[in-house]
Amino acid sequence: MIQPQTCLNVADNSGAKKLMCIRVLGTNRRYGHVGDVIIGVVKDATPNLTVKRSDVVRAVIVRTKQSIRRKDGSRLRFDDNATVIINKENNPRGTRVFGPIARELKDNGFTKIVSLAPEVL
């Protein structure tokens, strides 16, 4: 469950390392889960890359510590909360994605991120 003021890791090579959620997009949404789009501010960034510190960006949640319940009854839980920074067309701003991501992103229309990921669980 991601809510405003939650700090997340960034799982791509766009230049940001840490992101703080300031809004979960959707009508009156309080919590975000895997596959939800958030608005966040970059808290830590690598110098000389496309995303700078204090930039306001859109991102999609790819991993959460809160377990994901699947239709078959199984549960999936990750070690960290992570996002991938996206543009207005829901395409990733980076060219690589690090770490595993959940299969639920494919159902939400983020096929480009799924194709870049090294492992889909």
Curated annotation (Swiss-Prot):
GO terms under cellular component: chloroplast; cytosolic large ribosomal subunit
CDD domains: Ribosomal_uL14
InterPro entries attached to this UniProt entry: Ribosomal_uL14, Ribosomal_uL14_bac-type, Ribosomal_uL14_CS, Ribosomal_uL14_sf
One GO BP: translation
Alphabetized GO MF terms: large ribosomal subunit rRNA binding; structural constituent of ribosome
Quaternary assembly: Part of the 50S ribosomal subunit.
Function: Binds to 23S rRNA.
Protein name: Large ribosomal subunit protein uL14c
